[in-house]
Amino acid sequence: LTYLIPDFQNPSATTYSEEKREAVCDIVKKYDGILIEDSPYSELYFDKKSKYISASLPNNSFHLGSFSKTLVPSLRIGWIRADEEKIKSLLIIKESIDLHSCGLSQYILAEYLKDEVKYEKHLQEIRDDYKAKAQFFSKALKTIIPEFKHQTPKGGMFLYGGFEDKKIDTFALVQECLKKKVVYVPANQFYIDKVPNSEIRFNYTH
């Protein structure tokens, strides 16, 4: 079983190259494994959309998506694409957990999605908005804090990087930043041991 977020990962903002996607596909096929491809951010690409790995593994994959990142944050509705037999099994599991997701929310979403042009226009608008914010923020960081090393995002919602000086404790630093009404997530929160480090995850979409 392989679980991956190949597009604009949270927190690292990493996106798999085409070569790495092909390598993952080859490994899953070789061992007759199962791939869970989690894609909550894949539609938030700025220039080029990557091919889904699961598209090459129709019988050996689950492809997960969410509308909370692309439409409305409070709309906690997602979807799973898999072969028919796997979906049947998932339905039984879902019913045993909570019967079903909110019917009203699903109905509202279904009505909205009937207009594919409207939804695609919305996606393009937020892609353009996020791209402008990401590039502005990245340029500002490189100009004002050049010792903070990072890659300019190519999609998604996050910018991740770290200070050259590994002695900088970003967990302690955020306490001071909060006094100036500036907030970020110190990267030690994403590690098992929670040991302070010099890395930061920013969200540039607000």
Can you annotate each of these PLM segments?
Residues 1-206:
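PLP-dependent class I/II
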